[in-house]
C-alpha cells in the first residue's frame, strides 16, 4: 500500500550567502503525488528560489510515475533558470535516477551538506 506523499519547504542559505529553497519529500512518490511534488515546486517564488534542493531522505519508494513527476519538475526548473540538486536517495534510486538521465538536470548527493556546498 502506497503511503501519502508529504512535502514541505524550508529556507536555507548557501555557503555563498544565497537563499536556497529545500523541498523535503516524505512517503512514496507516485502518480498521486503530483500536487505534493509539482504543486509545491510551482508555488515557490521563482525570483527568490534560484537554488533548489530536493530532499529524498524520507522517501520510501518512487515508482515510474513518480520519476516522471521529478523529471517534469527538473525540466520546469531548467526552463526557469533555476539550479537544482538532490540528496538523500538510496543507492538503488541514485542508480535509477542516473539511468533515466535525471543527472543531466540535477546533481545527486548523499547529504544535504554536500548538496548545499555544490550549489
Task: For the regions a language model picked out, list residue spans one by one.
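Residues at or immediately preceding the N-termini of alpha-helices
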Residues: 34, 112-113
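A short, charged, amphipathic alpha-helix used as a generic interaction element across diverse proteins
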Residues: 115-119
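Amphipathic alpha-helical interaction surfaces in cytosolic regulatory modules
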Residues: 28-106
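Short acidic-hydrophobic, aromatic-tinged amphipathic segments that line or gate anion-handling sites
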Residues: 107-111
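Intrinsic disorder/low-complexity segments enriched in polar/small residues
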Residues: 5, 11-12, 73, 83, ...
